Amino acid sequence: MHALSGFSLVSLLSLGYLSWDWAKPGLVADGPAEAEDQPSAAPPQPPHIIFILTDDQGYHDVGYHGSDIETPTLDRLAAEGVKLENYYIQPICTPSRSQLLTGRYQIHTGLQHSIIRPRQPNCLPLDQVTLPQKLQEAGYSTHMVGKWHLGFYRKECLPTRRGFDTFLGSLTGNVDYYTYDNCDGPGVCGFDLHEGESVAWGLSGQYSTMLYAQRASHILASHSPQKPLFLYVAFQAVHTPLQSPREYLYRYRTMGNVARRKYAAMVTCMDEAVRNITWALKRYGFYNNSVIIFSSDNGGQTFSGGSNWPLRGRKGTYWEGGVRGLGFVHSPLLKKKRRTSRALVHITDWYPTLVGLAGGTTSAADGLDGYDVWPAISEGRASPRTEILHNIDPLYNHARHGSLEGGFGIWNTAVQAAIRVGEWKLLTGDPGYGDWIPPQTLASFPGSWWNLERMASIRQAVWLFNISADPYEREDLADQRPDVVRTLLARLADYNRTAIPVRYPAANPRAHPDFNGGAWGPWASDEDEEEEDEEEEGRARSFPRGRRKKKCKICKLRSFFRKLNTRLMSHRI
């Protein structure tokens, strides 16, 4: 005890000498935070796949990008693996998750607009074969821990019906980290933590980052390394609300900005969670035949403590700060390690890449927009991807200065869209707030937040950048290169011809948690689904003679909420 004199428990935690995972009996056995690497041997096939997804982590919010936030585990794993420095995701939650699990752009799943909200009768289309389903076909055990956010209005939409053997996590977009409550408007609140298809009331009170890491470790402890495993860990961190255990806040006590301080503490806690999962992989015999993929889901929300510096924009925008992702691959199976890859990679690419690693196959009939990029990542070959459709959102067409004439008669530039072809990036419509927010503006709150470098022109609806030469999007070349603008507008039009209609239904009052025992969960039946389909068809064409819509109070409420969605909810993320 004398050796510890002058030190407090908090100071030990702040220095990283204690770990909440293996410090608790029965979760992970006592031992060092990093186990020794196991002797190399010819790995069996196929490999174990661990996909770790973080929520709202900014491009600048990792140590190896020069952040003031401590992420020693992520820094080490990235340094020993392959850093993906030309990696793209989507600007908000649902689209990134849908593209990860389907390998398809939003325009091919009907999820082009916004996110799936708790009261919407909507989910990842049931006709889509998901990544975990393909891995199950290849003989994998599949497990998910964390945030789903792909819809749940019917039981068929739940993770355990979409390819996962087990699930522990939340179904909605953001919950309290301790109580797991989530509100979708004033007075519309419910509990959202689920174990399989049941509400996990008994787990309330445990900080979600720790709970999810502990569950991941339990899965590894109870699973045989001889059977291939797919473990998808979708942390809630570091999405709002900004909540962190006190011991992590203490580490950043000198940060002047309260939001940044809480955010930094959450990132470091998440980093330690990744450390504990990695340690469990080594302890239970998975590591030598494993592939660990780390990815953010969208850009950081700068007004909630995140930073995307030196990139332009933030979460919810199509500037680089909204769509450039944090990503790396760590694996003993990599042929060329300890390097940075500039190969163009998009989140849709993980579907065919991981199916290929698993020994499965994909074909043109699958309609995938992703590519198998494993040779580019593992061996340093050229990426098969040369372009990315960031999105086309036909419902978001409010740019005042956009028009079909402004798009050379090829494209209505009022429509929000963004595309990358080779080194060129084109944006139309309203891409979102395009500020550059350097880290020094985060020193205090709220005054210095507004001391930003604002984008110079707002009276336009077309932007063109050479991303290879200008990754920070400072020099708009649209006026200088109308030939390139025409080419990319035509490419947008080509993509748009393959798009399916947007599915963004109005909120359904029956989804209220009060009708489901106080918890968010499935509420619709097959009859409800038929009625929804009937309403969708009715908006596109007149009903045939002799067929009449049901008259009901709920239908009138749906009409009201649909109008409300159009005016207000389309602007929220």
From Swiss-Prot:
Q: Under which EC number(s) is this enzyme classified?
A: 3.1.6.-
Keywords noted in UniProt: Calcium, Endoplasmic reticulum, Glycoprotein, Hydrolase, Metal-binding, Secreted, Signal
Question: Catalytic residues per the record?
Answer: 93 (nucleophile), 149
Q: Which GO terms describe its cellular component?
A: endoplasmic reticulum; extracellular region
Q: Which residues are glycosylated?
A: 276, 288, 466, 496
Residues bound to substrate:
147, 239, 315
Chain positions covered by the region annotation Disordered: 506-550
Q: Where is this gene product found?
A: Secreted; Endoplasmic reticulum
A GO molecular-function annotation: metal ion binding
Protein's UniProt keywords contain Transmembrane helix: no
Q: What are the 3-oxoalanine (Cys) sites (modified residues) in this protein?
A: 93
Q: List positions binding Ca(2+).
A: 55-56, 93, 297-298
Name this protein carries in UniProt: Arylsulfatase I
Taxonomy, top ranks, is: Eukaryota, Metazoa, Chordata, Craniata, Vertebrata
